[in-house]
């Protein structure tokens, strides 16, 4: 149902908003002001409540009008012949349900009525001539017009008895008399005919419009008067209540003042016996406000002032303003204090001297090298001046801000009789100690935590599909080539318990990422395809899990395929030490179908059972520690790191050290992309606020304050740089021959830029493993982010090839690369990168395919068509877009899709190409996630002959 605001209801019924709000509150509705909304039924209830009150007032006032209307109706009935039965039924007044008055509608009706009367008066002179002609008409026509007049009079009576709307139509008028002639008349001609009939027939009653208008105006004025009177009464009542509240507050203040006065008199009487015991006479009470004007005598000392009465009563030559200025002047203060520093004002009682609290010296003192005198004084609860004095007696000249060595501190503590102990220095930059030593955990606060489960297996065995089924999402559709290329962490809930899943890539290049996933996991789900069996990466995942000491749950996937053979998988895994519990082993085996959601619940129950056996615990009260799952550089947010909290609770604004970087947690999002303020153990979150992008696999720890975190992060970065410099191999006599031999080897210099840190590591490791005799790969630089001008400059200086993985160069970098003749290779699948570099090293690039960019277009608008897909309306900003070209969808300098065009149109026509500065529409095969401001890059692969 629709809602209405109270001020709209007030406007419709002609009441003030305040009255409507009060009436709504009296009806039990929950409203606050005139802007509150109510349902339509409640609005009708409010309007009807006002209408009921108005009807009662109007009934008494309009009794005379009703009597006059009844007399007119009787006269018309007597003089008018009886029309047809249908006309009588139509002309009867309709019983109208009493409504609330609408003054606006009444004013409009009166205006229309007055306009009609003026028009009728102007046409009377012209109508007199036509009246003589009408006397010769037939009796049937006269009867018909008499019926019209009777109907119009009845319509006027209905107009008097209900609010007029100005659009009332006399339907009965159309049913009587000559229908052919009446259809040609409009509303004005009918009114003129009715007026003429009134002139020709002397016996017909006339309507007194002036009397009726005066009655309406009087009724409206009475209503306005009632409203003004009610508002005046409300204002008077509010003033009375306000005055009453002020009087009550004043009475309460007077009562409190009287009680305070009585209390002071009682306390003064209680102190009189004590004062009488003293030898001095009782002094009169002195007004406190006058004490400020009394000034101390200017005697040289107290005795002299007491002996000499003239000097005691002598006024200062300075006026009161000068004395006040002397208080604000340091020079005058010093001068006057020298004269009368011992003199006290006789009117003020002496203030008691606060005694210094005595603090016991500590029995032991733990010091660190370089402590200052002020720090030592604060620790042993002594004044710095006292310690400086002791040091001076020992022959050491020091100030309170001067640092002391260990021997001096020990001698000082011996003088005080305190046992001094040197503080054991803890390397604050070493965050690895939190992962090896559990002594900082409180056993009373340790609670159960969610298990961290890593899904491992060979390429395309269904790892991401299984996780997709668990999360009811479509993660697998976003991976280029159908393989997962960087780790993802997600959390689901099963049977009231949370489970954290880590999805690792299965490709051989991502060995380090799989090892990293095994190091932070609690349970490993080894997924094996029932039709493929055990593959190389399956064996590698088994070795990683065994090295980490993690229990393994085997999920035999794709059992729905015709060639599935789970028994063969079980026997092959038994050869590698993975024995099923059915065969007497320790590993759980579950046959599933991730695609058709078969036995997924059984797999989750097995995970919870193994987690319960492992007894996974954590302390959520300590400062958080954990591991970096993934890190990347976002264009708008900066460094973004995906963290897995292992101990403690991570909060927003926590100072944190992540690997060799530091910062403060500015924002934190969970796996669903929602902002969170805290993350408990076993929870994956993405954070921002780091000064640099950390490395995937680094540990992180939260520090007490930002100063300590900054110091630890800078120290760790310094140590990492020093270690990198020490690893530089220097030429010696022993390796001289190897160095000369290496100089003959040709090198392929590459610069690697990728979207995430894990992809950078995997790509660099894969390229370095390529073994081609006489050629080796040299990774000059690797980083996260888009290809920029600095990368092009470095590539030109080192004669290197830039390899971009899921990133794009900036327009400035592309222009500089074209000018400097620097080659940029862009890829989205790691297979292609390895194959291309390997064949380049082997010299098997004949023929060679070179990418040629045809043009770029910007998406201006998108249109979603059912059963067709998403159509992107674009404008070509550079070059052209052809029908047979391949396209890349670039969003924030990151390639999100690479494919072919499904259609290319200019308006409604299919075209082969669209040139520069032209608009068109396109559809991309297998991709509907086109958004406004996406960049569409059209390119073709041209075959060139290697020279």
From Swiss-Prot:
- Which residue intervals are annotated with compositional bias (Basic residues) in the record? 335-345
Main location per the UniProt record: cytoplasm
Signal sequence region: none
Q: Which InterPro entries match?
A: EF-G-like_DII, IF2_II, IF2_N, P-loop_NTPase, Small_GTP-bd, T_Tr_GTP-bd_dom, TF_IF2_bacterial-like, TIF_IF2
Has the keyword Hydrolase been applied to this entry?
A: no
Where in or outside the cell it occurs: the entry states:
Cytoplasm
One of the record's GO molecular function terms: translation initiation factor activity
Q: Which domain of life is it from?
A: Bacteria
List where Low complexity composition bias occurs.
76-90, 190-204, 316-334
Question: Which parts of this chain are annotated as the region G2?
Answer: 482-486
Renumbered to this chain, region (G3) spans: 503-506
Region G5, as annotated, extends over 593-595
Kindly list the positions annotated as binding GTP: 457-464, 503-507, 557-560
tr-type G domain: from which residue to which, for each copy?
Answer: 448-617
Q: Which GO terms describe its cellular component?
A: cytosol
Sequence segments annotated as region (G1)? 457-464
- What are the start and end residues of every segment in region (Disordered)? 55-361
By sequence similarity, the record places it as follows:
Belongs to the TRAFAC class translation factor GTPase superfamily. Classic translation factor GTPase family. IF-2 subfamily.
- State what this protein does: One of the essential components for the initiation of protein synthesis. Protects formylmethionyl-tRNA from spontaneous hydrolysis and promotes its binding to the 30S ribosomal subunits. Also involved in the hydrolysis of GTP during the formation of the 70S ribosomal complex.
Family annotation (HAMAP family): IF_2_B (MF_00100_B)
Q: What is this protein called?
A: Translation initiation factor IF-2
Organism of origin: Streptococcus equi subsp. zooepidemicus (strain MGCS10565)
